[in-house]
From Swiss-Prot:
Membrane topology: Multi-pass membrane protein
Cysteine disulfide partners in this protein: 37-40, 99-104
Encoding gene per record: bdbC1
Name assigned to this protein: Probable disulfide formation protein C 1
PANTHER family: DISULFIDE FORMATION PROTEIN-RELATED, SPBETA PROPHAGE-DERIVED DISULFIDE BOND FORMATION PROTEIN B
Protein family (similarity comment): Belongs to the DsbB family. BdbC subfamily.
Described purpose of this protein according to its UniProt entry: Required for disulfide bond formation in some proteins.
Main location class: membrane
Parts of the chain that traverse the membrane: 8-27, 42-61, 68-85, 113-135
Subcellular location: Cell membrane
One protein family per Pfam: DsbB
GO biological process, one term: protein folding
GO molecular function: protein-disulfide reductase activity
Annotated keywords: Cell membrane, Chaperone, Disulfide bond, Electron transport, Membrane, Oxidoreductase, Redox-active center, Transmembrane, Transmembrane helix, Transport
Length: 139
């Protein structure tokens, strides 16, 4: 497979991950009525713009977006990882209780005993970061 096709597929995959993450986030808050905590809002701030940015980049085949999406997705992943640690690691749990009106330790979902909303966001950010790295690597 050619370099440009790899870049195209990676960029589209990153956009798809951001689109699914945004739809999932809106589903949980607007349909299921789960109120987001402060850290959830920060994750949304980092995730939602990717739908527009990466969507435009896919249409224009502008692979330079990866230079910006990689660090932004990495920061979002760090926030998600910290939030997940607050939920799952006892030593971090004390920090989550004073997070805001809705405690960051709350687990609206807990599929298979480990898949929570911050974990899903983490997977989305990692997917975007890896795809961005692939785009950069194949320049």
């Amino acid at each position: 497979m050619g370099r440009e096709k790899k870049q195209e597929y990676a960029l589209f995959t990153a956009w798809g991950a951001s689109f699914i993450a945004t739809l999932g986030s809106l589903y949980f808050s607007e349909i299921m009525k789960f109120e987001p905590c402060v850290l959830c809002w920060y994750q949304r701030i980092f995730m939602y713009p990717f739908v527009l940015w990466l969507g435009i980049a896919v249409v224009k085949k502008d692979y330079r977006i990866a230079n910006y999406s990689l660090p932004i997705a990495s920061i979002g992943a760090c926030i998600s990882l910290y939030h997940y640690a607050i939920q799952k690691i006892a030593a971090f749990s004390a920090a989550g209780a004073a997070c805001g009106r809705v405690p960051c330790t709350g687990e609206y979902i807990n599929w298979f005993g480990f898949v929570t909303i911050p974990f899903l966001a983490l997977i989305g950010f990692i997917t975007i970061a890896v795809c961005s790295f692939i785009v950069i690597k194949n320049k």
